[in-house]
Amino acid sequence: MNARENQVRRFQQAMEQPIDIPMSSKELMLRMSFIDEEVKELRDEVVTAVKELGDTAEVSHEIRVKLLKELSDVMYVASGFAVTFGFPISRAFDRVHASNMSKMVDG
């Protein structure tokens, strides 16, 4: 487990949210609703950034900060999904990274 998942685990403990539980339809849908909500907020900021790029050919510091915040929220709720169900997300991420790196072609 990496530092991010440890932080989320501490948050879930403090908020008396479930950790390392068996999957249930109810909890899966709840966790997915958190992800959906945060992805929508990120999408809204991306749309704002695209509009700003069309108007000024650059993205303001304010919008960049909002994008970073929303991206971090997506990561947080994804980590919460992993913590809730006891997924070894760090190992899985490492495997995905290794797989992606193996797809690189020289030259």
How would you describe each model-predicted region?
Residues M1-G107:
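Flexible "arm" and connector segments at domain edges
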